[in-house]
Amino acid sequence: MTQFDVTDTPSESELAAISEGLTAFNTTDVGPSRRRPLAVLIRDESGKTIGGVSGYTAWGWLFTAWLFVPETLRGQGMAGKLLEAAEAEAEARGCQGAWIDTFNPQALRAYQRQGYAVFGELPDFPAGRSRFFLQKKLSPR
């Protein structure tokens, strides 16, 4: 008999079963994702990573999962420079678009300055804020 097991401590193999199953389904449904990690790192004088942007490209799109600029570098256009570098690599990989989400008002404005447009909003995530989903058209090379 099929059963559900609710847990906050799934094993790596349990998570892999879900991921591998969905990946196989999606590959059959729409073709391989050709998913590749993408990161643009900010390093200090000693070479230590202190910030940057990370995400991946898949199905012709760049998804930015994380973008962090250290406080000492904020207000200098760093977020835009990071996005431009990630977008250039995504275009070189043949991507036609990019998407990102945020619930931070300053980040929202920064992304909009870079040409991203809101295509969705999730109100009260987190409470008192909205989570915005943004996209931008890229020019694949």
Question: Which functions belong to the PLM regions below?
Answer:
Residues 2-65, 70, 105, 124, ...:
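Acetyl-CoA-dependent GNAT
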Residues 99-101, 117-133:
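Conserved catalytic-core motifs of GNAT/GCN5-like acyltransferases
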Residues 90-103:
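Conserved GNAT acetyl-CoA-binding A-motif
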Residues 18, 111, 116:
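Conserved active-site tyrosine of GNAT-family acetyltransferases
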Residues 73-74, 97:
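Acidic/histidine-enriched, beta-strand-rich ligand/metal-binding domains
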Residues 79, 83, 104-107, 124-130:
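Short glycine/proline-centered loop/turn elements that form peptide/ligand docking sites
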Residues 75-88, 113:
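Conserved acetyl-CoA-binding loop-helix of GNAT-fold acetyltransferases
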